[in-house]
Amino acid sequence: MSRDELRIVLGAMIPNMEEGFEIKTRDGAILRVDPEWECCKEFKDGLKAEIIKQLKSKPAVVFGYS
C-alpha cells in the first residue's frame, strides 16, 4: 500500500467508521457493525495504530535519485 493510499484510509475510511461499517462475508451476506460495540472500537483503534505504524516505517520517496 502506498503512502497516498494510507493517507486516504486515514482521512476517509476511519472517520466514516464512526457511524459503523459493513462487512461482506465470503458467502455474500452483509453484516452491519454497530460503532458502539466494544469490539468495533478495538478494531478501529487497532486499524489506526497499524496504519500509522506502516506510515512511519515506510521510507520517504526522494525524487531524482535511483
From Swiss-Prot:
Record's keyword terms, sorted: Early protein
Function: Involved in the depression of host DNA replication.
Protein name, UniProt field: Protein dhr
Organism: Escherichia phage 186
